[in-house]
């Protein structure tokens, strides 16, 4: 038996990496009976006849899992936003962050296309990133000339997953980091101001101290797994300041003696972050129940 990590999955064939050697495997029928499917990122135990024929016998317990796209055992989710084409959006960024925290993922922020961004817009984005840094996020704002290899190798060890909407430059970033990958890229649609999907599946690529993965771009975010009363926990500063609210289950909206509302009034919480919290709270509150 061998133990390795699934690095690629296409049409029911799972490519497993063991110390740089890759094996094509399939899951045993036991998984189908249990209605359980391995995903990229899983640590698995498998037997092999040769590099093109192996069978997965066991999937080890996942420490976390992103559902869309399915990836497990993520150490850091890098949320990739572009400064322009498509334009930087704090609302979209906050929604990505909520998704990340709902799956117990450590998140950091990467903004691309600095070289295509007017100076005034660069200043505006830098000021916004300072707000996120004060909340506790690590951020980068990069252009075409920045050394991707230096950036990636400075990130923490383990599995790094790049995630973001289509057209923000995830595949371009990886091509600069590892030119031999030659990943397909595409410009954004001029009419829709969003990118076309060029990455169609998740694949892990080796890096000095772990793996890095590109993921298919998002066209929509799914919050079906999140309850309205959980959302405040996924806005880190609201969660932190909310610990001293009068009521333990305070949602920071109309409740009396709310420390979050107090911190908002004195400027310790950014108004746009609170507004995005309210928007998402109301959106999920008004969500139709699915049967």
Swiss-Prot record:
EC number: 3.6.1.-
Textual note on the cofactor: Binds 1 zinc ion per subunit.
Assembly notes: Monomer. Associates with 30S ribosomal subunit, binds 16S rRNA.
Function field: One of several proteins that assist in the late maturation steps of the functional core of the 30S ribosomal subunit. Helps release RbfA from mature subunits. May play a role in the assembly of ribosomal proteins into the subunit. Circularly permuted GTPase that catalyzes slow GTP hydrolysis, GTPase activity is stimulated by the 30S ribosomal subunit.
SUPFAM superfamilies, per the entry: Nucleic acid-binding proteins, P-loop containing nucleoside triphosphate hydrolases
Binding, GTP: 112-115, 164-172
Family label: Belongs to the TRAFAC class YlqF/YawG GTPase family. RsgA subfamily.
Highest taxon in the source lineage: Bacteria
Single GO term (MF): rRNA binding
Name under which the protein is recorded: Small ribosomal subunit biogenesis GTPase RsgA
Occurrences of domain CP-type G (ranges): 63-221
Binding site residues for Zn(2+): 245, 250, 252, 258
Cellular component aspect of the GO annotation: cytoplasm
One Gene Ontology biological process: ribosomal small subunit biogenesis
Keyword Nucleotide-binding: yes
Key word GTP-binding present: yes
Subcellular locations according to the entry: Cytoplasm
InterPro entries reported for this sequence: G_CP_dom (IPR030378), NA-bd_OB-fold (IPR012340), P-loop_NTPase (IPR027417), Ribosome_biogen_GTPase_RsgA (IPR004881), RsgA_GTPase_dom (IPR010914), RsgA_N (IPR031944)
Keywords: Cytoplasm, GTP-binding, Hydrolase, Metal-binding, Nucleotide-binding, Ribosome biogenesis, RNA-binding, rRNA-binding, Zinc
Pfam families: RsgA_GTPase, RsgA_N
Cofactor: Zn(2+)
Main subcellular localisation: cytoplasm
């Amino acid at each position: 038996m061998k133990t390795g990590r699934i690095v690629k999955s296409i049409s029911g064939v799972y490519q497993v990496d063991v110390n740089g050697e890759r094996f094509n495997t399939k899951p045993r029928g036991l998984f189908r009976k249990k209605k359980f499917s391995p995903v990229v990122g899983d640590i698995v135990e498998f037997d092999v006849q040769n590099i093109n024929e192996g069978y997965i016998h066991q999937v080890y317990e996942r420490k976390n899992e992103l559902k869309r796209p399915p990836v497990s055992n993520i150490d850091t989710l890098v949320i990739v936003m572009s400064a322009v084409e498509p334009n930087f959006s704090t609302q979209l960024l906050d929604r990505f962050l909520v998704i990340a925290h709902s799956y117990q993922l450590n998140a950091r922020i990467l903004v691309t296309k600095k070289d295509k961004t007017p100076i005034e817009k660069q200043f505006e984005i830098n000021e916004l990133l300072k707000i996120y840094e004060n909340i506790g996020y690590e951020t980068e704002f990069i252009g075409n000339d920045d050394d991707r290899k230096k950036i990636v190798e400075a990130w923490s060890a383990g599995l790094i997953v790049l995630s973001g909407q289509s057209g923000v430059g995830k595949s371009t970033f990886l091509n600069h980091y590892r030119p031999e990958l030659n990943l397909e890229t595409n410009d954004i649609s001029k009419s829709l101001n969003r990118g076309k999907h060029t990455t169609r599946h998740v694949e892990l690529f080796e890096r000095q101290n772990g793996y890095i993965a590109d993921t298919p771009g998002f066209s929509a975010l799914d919050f079906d797994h999140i309850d309205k009363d959980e959302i405040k926990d996924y806005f880190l500063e609201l969660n932190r300041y909310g610990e001293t609210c009068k009521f333990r289950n305070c949602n920071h909206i109309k409740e009396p003696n709310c420390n979050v509302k107090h911190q908002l009034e004195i400027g310790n919480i950014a108004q746009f972050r609170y507004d995005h919290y309210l928007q998402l709270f109301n959106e999920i509150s008004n969500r139709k129940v699915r049967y």
